[in-house]
């Protein structure tokens, strides 16, 4: 039941995310209100990388999809980078990634997450996957993923609104059902 709730929650977030990134331009992906503000393209990449790291590496002790499917080579980016600790200069100099390819990577990550959730037994949510991090259970990881996904999706929608003002979303926009 908990796995179903988490699945529904992240699927709903995905709907919000797809609405927020609909019709973005390359310029929109790179736009920064100030040099210290993360642009939409960087936020998207970071979201997908963090989910990949948490589920594949931290919980399951697998190679990340980023490495297994050689997405780091597709984007010509470092193997172990996920954005944590980036300086404003690194964020400003981050390359503009092809949105379609980035979304393809994100879809692979989400599929991996959902596949793992479908196999997860309720009691496994209390498992501590890493001895060196004894205070983090599988449930804690999913709480973090859900929180980060919604937070970053909100940031993306807000930035899009800053760029486009009243035209950020169509006049017939409604929240996903």
Predicted regions and their residues:
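Short Lys/Arg-rich basic patches
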Residues: 2-6
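Short, contiguous alpha-helical
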Residues: 7-11, 15-18, 28-85, 128-177
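A generic alpha-helix structural signal
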Residues: 21, 44, 103-106
């Amino acid at each position: 039941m908990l796995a179903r709730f988490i699945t529904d929650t992240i699927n709903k977030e995905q709907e919000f995310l797809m609405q927020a990134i609909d019709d973005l331009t390359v310029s929109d992906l790179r736009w920064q209100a100030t040099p210290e503000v993360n642009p939409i393209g960087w936020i998207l990449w970071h979201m997908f990388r963090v989910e990949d790291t948490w589920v594949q590496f931290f919980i399951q002790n697998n190679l990340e999809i980023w490495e297994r499917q050689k997405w780091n080579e597709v984007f010509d980016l470092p193997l172990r980078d996920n954005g944590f600790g980036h300086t404003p200069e690194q964020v400003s100099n981050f390359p503009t990634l092809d949105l379609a390819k980035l979304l393809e990577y994100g879809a692979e990550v989400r599929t991996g997450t959902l596949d793992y959730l479908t196999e997860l037994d309720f009691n496994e949510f209390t498992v501590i996957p890493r001895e060196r991090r004894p205070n983090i259970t599988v449930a804690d990881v999913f709480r973090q993923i859900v929180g980060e996904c919604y937070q970053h999706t909100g940031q993306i929608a807000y930035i899009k609104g800053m760029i486009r003002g009243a035209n950020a979303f169509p006049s017939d926009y409604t929240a996903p059902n």
